[in-house]
């Protein structure tokens, strides 16, 4: 018993330390480049921003399955990961190289289908990142497995700042959307070199037929799920670009990026360590379930008020940060910021289900989401434009995806009643934040003051909610230090 408690304490310490590094990494990666991103948006305008968005959508779609899901097996592998790393390297690089060639050749067709054939060279440059990603998929998974978030933080910071600096410099010289593509590619190369340097395992290729079946049984369902997840996540941008053109896509993507801030700040650091932390507790399902509800409660206290404040104050936020040229994106941000709160919940549930081996359930959920949202968005895009597409996404997520995740979690041993209680007060309080933020937007004429008022209100609500759960916060902080009972 003592041994189990000490092992759990060790895992908690590692996960806690990794989460702190991951959270710092995310905040630093976002706050600095935020200002560079604002400058780039003002320099490029919606049209060029939309051209780059076409290339980004293409890249993200391919990266969702480029290594066939096998690198994530590294995290779950109970034995020494060195036994499967050479094989996962081979699979990742071969599949990524083939996909890179396919995208480069098919770039003109892809660009035309997504709204602007002028995006072709940008798509081709961005496609080179696919093979780079495949090259370091296994080292990245190993760093995550070993909670080496300090090294990952440094690599991410170099990638972020280097890419942003190159992009801004080229944009000032009139390179347009290509400036963003080149900055991304150069930074990806440097990032890959750093991960290869810091990986605890030497980089080797190999082919072990004895483990191929096990790898593919785990990876293929996860890759298929990621494809459906990507299709579901980017179908809105594909529809906006193909139907309304690059200018409308630029407006939509700007709103999407703004709405993704709460997801990036609060969810992504957790996702960097949650799979490994959950995996370490797989032999104790009740503890996993309790930890899930506890993390969900704390995450909701912080993230939901921010998302709804951003939604209510969308107009002054866009006007102050990006200027009048981007004001039309406020109608999109209103819906996507509210959707961000649901996305944070979904990502936590996704990681939990994957760790316990329910990747098939995740695939079903994402397939249902895609099947329902696609026709709804297609019906909404013509009469209501890009804002209608955003509203359709929110409606489907609330009415279809949320219940499906709840059912899957219940079948996996999570007490949904506990989870519902965990989010009831944060959600109920945050719902009151939205009309207050909207009122600030309507009655305060100066955009900066309206946005600041909404932000201060959200901060006050977060403080009150977190204070209410201060015992849980203290328990999480101290659990890693516990020597007797965790």
Where do the PLM segments sit?
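Membrane-interface helix-loop junctions in multi-pass transport and translocation proteins
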Residues: 39-56, 108, 112, 120-121, ...
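Interhelical loop/hinge segments that connect adjacent transmembrane helices in multipass membrane
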Residues: 2-11, 15, 150, 193-234, ...
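Signature of the first transmembrane helix
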Residues: 3, 11-68, 95-107, 124, ...
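Alpha-helical transmembrane segments of multi-pass membrane transport and lipid-handling proteins
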Residues: 1-4, 27, 90-115, 121-125, ...
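Membrane-interface junctions at transmembrane-helix termini in multi-pass inner-membrane proteins
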Residues: 16, 73-82, 132-158, 173, ...
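Membrane-proximal transmembrane or re-entrant/amphipathic helices at the cytosolic face
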Residues: 1-9, 414-416, 423, 435-486
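Helix-loop junctions and terminal segments of transmembrane helices
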Residues: 33, 65-82, 144-145, 255, ...
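N-terminal membrane topogenesis motif
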Residues: 1-34, 75, 79-90, 117-119, ...
């Amino acid at each position: 018993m003592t041994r189990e408690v000490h092992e759990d304490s060790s895992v908690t310490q590692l996960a806690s330390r990794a989460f702190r590094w991951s959270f710092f990494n995310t905040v630093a990666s976002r706050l600095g480049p935020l200002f560079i991103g604002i400058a780039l948006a003002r320099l490029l305008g919606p049209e060029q921003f939309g051209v780059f968005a076409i290339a980004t959508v293409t890249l993200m779609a391919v990266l969702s399955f480029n290594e066939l899901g096998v690198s994530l097996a590294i995290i779950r592998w109970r034995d020494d990961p060195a036994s499967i790393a050479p094989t996962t390297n081979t699979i990742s690089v071969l599949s990524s190289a083939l996909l890179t060639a396919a995208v480069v050749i098919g770039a003109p067709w892809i660009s035309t289908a997504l709204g602007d054939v002028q995006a072709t060279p940008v798509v081709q440059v961005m496609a080179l990142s696919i093979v780079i990603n495949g090259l370091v998929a296994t080292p990245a998974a190993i760093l995550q497995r070993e909670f080496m978030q300090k090294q990952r933080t440094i690599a991410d910071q170099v990638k972020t700042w280097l890419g942003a600096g190159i992009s801004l410099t080229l944009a000032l010289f009139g390179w347009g959307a290509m400036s963003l593509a080149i900055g991304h590619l150069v930074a990806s190369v440097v990032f890959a070199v750093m991960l290869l340097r810091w990986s605890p395992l030497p980089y080797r290729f190999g082919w072990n037929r004895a483990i191929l079946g096990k790898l593919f049984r785990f990876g293929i369902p996860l890759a298929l799920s990621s494809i459906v997840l990507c299709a579901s996540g980017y179908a809105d941008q594909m529809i906006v670009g193909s139907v309304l053109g690059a200018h409308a896509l630029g407006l939509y993507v700007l709103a999407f990026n703004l709405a993704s801030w709460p997801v990036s700040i609060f969810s992504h650091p957790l996702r960097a360590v949650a799979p490994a932390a959950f995996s370490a507790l797989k032999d104790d399902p009740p503890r996993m379930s309790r930890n899930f509800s506890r993390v969900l409660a704390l995450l909701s206290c912080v993230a939901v008020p921010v998302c709804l404040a951003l939604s209510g104050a969308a107009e002054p936020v866009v006007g102050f940060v990006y200027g009048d040229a981007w004001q039309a994106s406020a109608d999109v941000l209103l819906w996507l910021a509210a959707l961000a709160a649901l996305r944070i919940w979904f990502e936590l549930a996704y990681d939990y289900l994957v760790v316990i081996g329910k990747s098939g359930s995740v695939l079903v959920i994402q397939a249902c989401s895609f099947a329902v949202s696609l026709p709804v968005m297609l019906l909404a895009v013509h009469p209501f434009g890009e804002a209608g597409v955003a509203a359709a996404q929110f409606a489907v997520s609330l009415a279809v995806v949320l219940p499906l995740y709840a059912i899957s979690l219940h079948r996996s041993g999570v007490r949904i009643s506990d989870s519902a209680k965990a989010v009831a007060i944060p959600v109920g309080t945050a719902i009151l934040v939205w009309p207050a933020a909207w009122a600030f937007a309507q009655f305060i004429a100066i955009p900066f003051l309206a946005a600041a008022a909404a932000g201060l209100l959200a901060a006050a609500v977060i403080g009150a909610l977190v204070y209410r759960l201060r015992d849980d916060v203290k328990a999480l902080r101290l659990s890693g230090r516990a020597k007797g009972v965790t």
